[in-house]
Each structure stands twice: as C-alpha cells, then as structure tokens.
C-alpha cells in the first residue's frame, strides 16, 4: 500500500496549498453533518469525524464555529450528498464526491470537467466496485509494532499497519475510524498528519507522460468545482 499512501500524502500537500478552498469545503461539510444530526460532536458521530479530519488541515476554529452556528440557527440551505463516477485517459478510474444544493448544476459541471479533459462520466457503480472505503491515519513517534500491540489490546482488527518515512500508517474499516482514533489518543497520540475517510483503489495503473498531463488537468478541473468535496482515482502519480 506504499504507493497509495504516497498518493494520499501528495494529494493532502496539494490541498494544503489551497487553504481557502479547503476551508470552504470543510465549512460546508461541517454544516451538513451538524444539520443532519445534533450540532454537538459528542452526540453526533458524523460531525465528530468531520471535525477530526478538519484538524489535520488546520481549519480555523472560526470557520468550524460559524458552520455549526449556521446549522443551529435552522438555516434552510439543504445539500445532497452525491457521488459521480467516471473514466480518464487510458481507462483510468475516478470517483467524485459532492455536496450540492443544485443537483442539475453539479451534474453538468462534473460531466463537463470529465468531457473537456479526455474523460467521460460513467453510470453509478461503473467504477466504485474497484475501490474500498477506508479509514487511514498517519503519525510519527511510534513503531508499527507499538501500534499493532495497541490495537490488539483494544481488540481492534485493522486492515494493515505500515511504517514509511518515519510515519506509521494505519488502514482500517470506515466504521473503525472513531475507535482507532480514540485508542491512539488514549496512548498519547494526538498529532495526525492524516486522519481521513477515503476511497482507496484496489489496484493502481501507470499512465504515459502525455496521459498523466491530461489526467492531472482533469483532476484539477474536478477539484476546482465548488460542489466537489473529494476526488479519488486509481492512477499512480
């Protein structure tokens, strides 16, 4: 899973350079999670997970508070959680996760981003079966053996624990996100370089240099869309 970890790390580094866009996307996601349940993360698991993820991107407290207050205030802005699937150059596969208050606009924008950059939007299920929903954590200061022992003591059977570039990486089931993180926190691990819920490709493909350029242009076009929250793919970059 080393290459997959590198892809996630590079994607996060790229996002870190676009902080205002990242903050806006998290603001929307926090608002939706708070509005769909209780605005208190202690009683709203979905909100708690979003807030933990937001911490790894250093989302300012003011943005978090504003989104939660907006949800508390009974704002009538409603968003749909929609997934689009498609293909890029040479059969590469892409999943696009969105939060939208205008389904027609979002579908049109996503289709255009694919079509104008050598790709095409597929039907629901055409790509997702080649990805696994995964919780991933990365942090420093421990060894893989330390963490394996910790997880065993907590009776949490994660998918994999690796060591790379001074980081320990944990791959777990999505529903284990909270249990894994709480176990790590109880052991004094509170600084995560990555704490994410992602769609992880089961297999990665390698593209030609020319196709990589076109593929990256397509991914940039998708990620630039206001309604797009996450873009996942199976290309080794």
Swiss-Prot record:
Question: Looking at the keywords, is DNA-binding present?
Answer: yes
Q: Where in the cell is it found?
A: Cytoplasm
| Gene Ontology BP, a term | regulation of DNA-templated transcription
One function term, GO molecular function aspect = DNA binding
Spell out the GO cellular component terms annotated for this protein, sorted alphabetically and separated by semicolons. Answer: cytosol
Its primary localisation, in coarse terms, equals cytoplasm
Q: Which SUPFAM superfamilies match?
A: YebC-like
Please name the InterPro entries in this protein's record. Integrase-like_N, TACO1_YebC-like_2nd/3rd_dom, TACO1_YebC_N, Transcrip_reg_TACO1-like, Transcrip_reg_TACO1-like_dom3, Transcrip_reg_TACO1_YeeN, YebC-like
Q: Which UniProt keywords apply?
A: Cytoplasm, DNA-binding, Transcription, Transcription regulation
* Recorded family membership: Belongs to the TACO1 family. YeeN subfamily.
PANTHER family (UniProt xref): TRANSLATIONAL ACTIVATOR OF CYTOCHROME C OXIDASE 1
The entry's protein name is Probable transcriptional regulatory protein Exig_1693
What organism does the UniProt record list as the source? Exiguobacterium sibiricum (strain DSM 17290 / CCUG 55495 / CIP 109462 / JCM 13490 / 255-15)
């Amino acid at each position: 899973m080393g290459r997959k970890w590198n892809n996630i790390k590079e994607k996060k580094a790229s996002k870190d350079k676009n902080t205002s866009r990242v903050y806006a996307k998290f603001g929307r996601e926090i608002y939706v999670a708070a509005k769909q349940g209780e605005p208190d993360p202690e009683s709203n698991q979905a909100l708690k997970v979003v807030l933990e993820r937001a911490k790894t991107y250093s989302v300012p407290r003011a943005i978090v508070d504003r989104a939660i207050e907006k949800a508390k205030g009974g704002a009538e802005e409603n968003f749909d959680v929609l997934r689009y699937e498609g293909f890029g150059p040479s059969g590469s596969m892409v999943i696009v996760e969105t939060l939208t208050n205008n389904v027609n606009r979002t579908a049109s924008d996503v289709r255009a981003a694919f079509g104008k950059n050598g790709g095409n939007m597929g039907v629901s299920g055409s790509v997702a079966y080649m990805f696994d929903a995964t919780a991933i954590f990365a942090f420093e200061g421990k060894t893989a053996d330390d963490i394996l022992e910790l997880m065993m003591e907590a009776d949490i059977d994660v998918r994999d624990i690796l060591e790379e570039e001074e980081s320990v990486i944990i791959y777990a089931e999505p529903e284990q996100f909270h249990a894994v993180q709480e176990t790590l926190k109880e052991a004094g691990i509170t600084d995560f370089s990555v704490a994410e819920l992602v769609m992880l490709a089961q297999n990665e493909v390698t593209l030609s240099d020319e196709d990589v350029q076109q593929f990256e242009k397509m991914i940039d076009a998708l990620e630039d869309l206001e309604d797009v929250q996450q873009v996942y793919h199976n290309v080794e970059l």
